[in-house]
Amino acid sequence: MMTSTRALVAGFLLALSSPALTTALAAQEAPATTVAADPAAPVWAFEESDVPVDESFIFGRLDNGMRYIIRRNATPEGTALVRMRIGSGSLAETEDERGLAHYLEHMAFNGSKGIPEGEMVKLLEREGLAFGADTNASTGFESITYMLNLPRNDSTLLDTALTLMRETASELTIAPDAVDRERGVVLAERRDRAGFQQRNFEDNVAFLAPGARYAERLPIGTIASLEGATAQHIRGLYERTYVPANTVLVVVGDYPVEQVEAAIRARFASWTPAPVPTEPVTGPIDITRKGLTDIHLDPALAEEVTLSRFSAWRDEPDTVANRDAALARRIGYGIVNRRLARLARGEDAPFRGASFGTGELFEAARITSLTISSADGEWEKGMRAAVREVNEALTHGFTRAELDEQLANLRTAFENAAKGAETRSHGAFVNAALALASDDRVPTTPEWQLAQFERIAPELTPEAVWQAVREDAAPLAEPLIRFEGRTAPAGGAEALRSAFAAAMALPIAAPADNGPLAFGYGDFGSPGEVVSDT
């Protein structure tokens, strides 16, 4: 099942019809702007949610608008993690800034007012802090995150870490000569990523999202924009997006929260407030897009066919009711995918693997997809089997035994999480904090999650989870069909569409319902006799 808003972006991108496309493109090339933060707006998502926040987190906001999240944790003991999330990524770039959010990430390690160029890496090494590609920073569509893993929990190292983050926040020098020296590194990184996976992604974008803004704002940028980047260009993006109200600092580790909070205030209170950047355009989007076919070939690609349809995005804030609904959908998709997995593991399996699910694309649209991976030349066999299985599930529903299996697996997962609540790693808490910052997902305790599951589980029926999936999934009629692999399918696009039509026409039948699952070992034979107890 696909659920993550951001995880789907690389796989599925959208487009609009020509009239809307013209309007949206005109809008997206308007000058970048900022807006004043609304002081009356909620600071955190849990302020407007009935989902109870984990009170072991400490949440705060400085007068300049910067927010912070602190959590004391001793797993592993004597260590800590520090993260600084800037709430703008490559989507915030203008046309001539493409790739500069990532370029700016590089410049964070090339000199600031308090740490001269070349000294930051030495400082990291002296303090035993890890340094390397993707170790200290990461740039995405919607954010840039700076990362430091502290191997000790002394106050000096905490101060050093916060100093590095504070310098990055507003004190970078972005000197022209330093920009020129780093250009080769950035271009080399882009070349290194320009392999078959990148080509496959770009073809997918061109098929699903011609002209969509986020299809044209890959974080790695373009050769032309990177070669032409100047210190002035980079500084313009820096000053527009690195502002207190657009920043969340997270510290999780073996420190007293009072110490961390005081250190944050001491370092960041002087950061001058500024308007937050406006939300960037992510579309244009046409959720009626259908009936098109794409074939992408590369010697390095395994054979795979994806059938997709779009639907409208739904605003579903994090509430108890919405979590209940999401659980029902999760179980329903889990049953469908369990059936597909059983086919993949069977004798003379029709495909290597298949998955069915629905997820969000930013706040722009939703996409339902059935993806089938097959041995070379076996795509038609795989498509027929997978489409038939999904149609059967969506037409006739699920059995009690299938529901019980999903509930049992989920119960075990929730129980194990609750049992291990006191030994959760720093990373688990950091991920929860960043999910609140990025997706307004309220961090909760494992004990509460288990209690909520036990509350709703008795109310779930095969009919309920079936209807949840039927209402959530976009019908795969006239889907967008994308083929990728080493060898073109015989008959090309017409054969793909004909095979899909034939698969949709296959007869289907309701599965046998053998009732609730029962323990498989009910007869243990006659009791034995104790012959020795020594």
Predicted regions and their residues:
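N-terminal secretory signal peptides that target proteins for export/translocation
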Residues: 1-5
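Bacterial N-terminal signal peptides
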Residues: 9-20
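Proteolytic maturation boundary segments
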Residues: 26-70, 256-341, 345, 404-408, ...
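Scaffold signal of the M16-like zinc-metallopeptidase fold and its non-catalytic homologs
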Residues: 32-42, 110-115, 133, 137, ...
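Active-site-adjacent, His/Asp/Glu-enriched structural segments that form or flank metal-binding
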Residues: 76-77, 86-101, 106-199, 225-228, ...
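Generic recognition of stable, solvent-exposed alpha-helical segments in well-folded globular domains
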Residues: 99, 115, 119, 156-160, ...
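Structured mid-domain segments that build the active-site/substrate or prosthetic-cofactor binding neighborhood
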Residues: 305, 312-315, 321-400
